[in-house]
């Protein structure tokens, strides 16, 4: 029987669970210290926790529910990990180096059902949600790697932009956020965390009401319904008429800036007229809007799309700026490895399938 990951419990939940099992509440703080400060990888290493408590934890929880299957390192310091879960499923996690610190991109689902026509993540459909513990454990595995190579570095930023739709796994995603933000543990600042959604409007309202101080990014990729439906099938169910009011509510409720993710596809959504249309869509909240322009990473299975030319990227950027919309072009990481989200996982599954025949 599979045991849940110990990393899925918030400090409050762990305190409550241990108390119900007859242990003193302070044991939870001790365990958390071992997990997140000393970062041990076995329960046996928790030397100031009594034997009965350790045996109970070991019987009830896993501290290593996933194993590293593949690791790719880029010349720029980016590392892409492929982890194998207890059920054999594969997920991706990426470590990126920035001037401001180390950022980890985590996965929230095994596969994805959103079906964006340019994305490698949706090549294999969703089979299940990840638990909160499995999401946290991705960060811990990256941190353990950093500890092992002796760099004395810590993960300082987190982006929830890996495989899957985070808002389709809402409760586990929120538990994950509460674990990594806790000052008793990883203590990753809320403003150093960004969650991305393809636009599940009802969950955007819910997320706004939580007022977590976490950054929100919307994967928009088109300034009108016709084009967005063409490249993102979710727009059929949640068109801009439903999405934009949710974005308005988020901005007004939180008074926080929102990031608009916009992947540039040559001849599809990268022309000046579309930049003007995008600027108009956000003109009433442009002071709280930032557009992240993303050069396309080609995916073999999506050969219909090509990367925009540098001239078209510059024109799009300049047009947004001239129309009062703050924007930037995303700095690329890991271009010499399987950089596109879901690409490494898809290749490994194909490789395993061929080997099994």
Curated annotation (Swiss-Prot):
<dbReference type="Pfam" id="PF04055">
    <property type="entry name" value="Radical_SAM"/>
</dbReference>
<keyword id="KW-0819">tRNA processing</keyword>
<dbReference type="InterPro" id="IPR013785">
    <property type="entry name" value="Aldolase_TIM"/>
</dbReference>
<dbReference type="Pfam" id="PF21016">
    <property type="entry name" value="RlmN_N"/>
</dbReference>
<keyword id="KW-0698">rRNA processing</keyword>
<feature type="binding site">
    <location>
        <position position="116"/>
    </location>
    <ligand>
        <name>[4Fe-4S] cluster</name>
    </ligand>
</feature>
<dbReference type="GO" id="GO:0046872">
    <property type="term" value="F:metal ion binding"/>
</dbReference>
<comment type="function">
    <text>Specifically methylates position 2 of adenine 2503 in 23S rRNA and position 2 of adenine 37 in tRNAs.</text>
</comment>
<keyword id="KW-0408">Iron</keyword>
<dbReference type="GO" id="GO:0000049">
    <property type="term" value="F:tRNA binding"/>
</dbReference>
<keyword id="KW-1015">Disulfide bond</keyword>
<comment type="similarity">
    <text>Belongs to the radical SAM superfamily. RlmN family.</text>
</comment>
<dbReference type="GO" id="GO:0070475">
    <property type="term" value="P:rRNA base methylation"/>
</dbReference>
<feature type="binding site">
    <location>
        <begin position="219"/>
        <end position="221"/>
    </location>
    <ligand>
        <name>S-adenosyl-L-methionine</name>
    </ligand>
</feature>
<keyword id="KW-0004">4Fe-4S</keyword>
<dbReference type="GO" id="GO:0051539">
    <property type="term" value="F:4 iron, 4 sulfur cluster binding"/>
</dbReference>
<dbReference type="InterPro" id="IPR027492">
    <property type="entry name" value="RNA_MTrfase_RlmN"/>
</dbReference>
<dbReference type="GO" id="GO:0019843">
    <property type="term" value="F:rRNA binding"/>
</dbReference>
<dbReference type="InterPro" id="IPR048641">
    <property type="entry name" value="RlmN_N"/>
</dbReference>
<keyword id="KW-0949">S-adenosyl-L-methionine</keyword>
<keyword id="KW-0479">Metal-binding</keyword>
<dbReference type="InterPro" id="IPR007197">
    <property type="entry name" value="rSAM"/>
</dbReference>
<feature type="active site" description="S-methylcysteine intermediate">
    <location>
        <position position="341"/>
    </location>
</feature>
<feature type="disulfide bond" description="(transient)">
    <location>
        <begin position="105"/>
        <end position="341"/>
    </location>
</feature>
<feature type="binding site">
    <location>
        <position position="119"/>
    </location>
    <ligand>
        <name>[4Fe-4S] cluster</name>
    </ligand>
</feature>
<keyword id="KW-0411">Iron-sulfur</keyword>
<dbReference type="GO" id="GO:0030488">
    <property type="term" value="P:tRNA methylation"/>
</dbReference>
<dbReference type="GO" id="GO:0002935">
    <property type="term" value="F:tRNA (adenine(37)-C2)-methyltransferase activity"/>
</dbReference>
<keyword id="KW-0489">Methyltransferase</keyword>
<feature type="binding site">
    <location>
        <position position="196"/>
    </location>
    <ligand>
        <name>S-adenosyl-L-methionine</name>
    </ligand>
</feature>
<keyword id="KW-0808">Transferase</keyword>
<dbReference type="GO" id="GO:0005737">
    <property type="term" value="C:cytoplasm"/>
</dbReference>
<dbReference type="GO" id="GO:0070040">
    <property type="term" value="F:rRNA (adenine(2503)-C2-)-methyltransferase activity"/>
</dbReference>
<feature type="binding site">
    <location>
        <begin position="164"/>
        <end position="165"/>
    </location>
    <ligand>
        <name>S-adenosyl-L-methionine</name>
    </ligand>
</feature>
<keyword id="KW-0963">Cytoplasm</keyword>
<feature type="binding site">
    <location>
        <position position="297"/>
    </location>
    <ligand>
        <name>S-adenosyl-L-methionine</name>
    </ligand>
</feature>
<protein>
    <recommendedName>
        <fullName>Probable dual-specificity RNA methyltransferase RlmN</fullName>
        <ecNumber>2.1.1.192</ecNumber>
    </recommendedName>
</protein>
<feature type="active site" description="Proton acceptor">
    <location>
        <position position="92"/>
    </location>
</feature>
<dbReference type="InterPro" id="IPR040072">
    <property type="entry name" value="Methyltransferase_A"/>
</dbReference>
<dbReference type="InterPro" id="IPR004383">
    <property type="entry name" value="rRNA_lsu_MTrfase_RlmN/Cfr"/>
</dbReference>
<feature type="domain" description="Radical SAM core">
    <location>
        <begin position="98"/>
        <end position="336"/>
    </location>
</feature>
<feature type="binding site">
    <location>
        <position position="112"/>
    </location>
    <ligand>
        <name>[4Fe-4S] cluster</name>
    </ligand>
</feature>
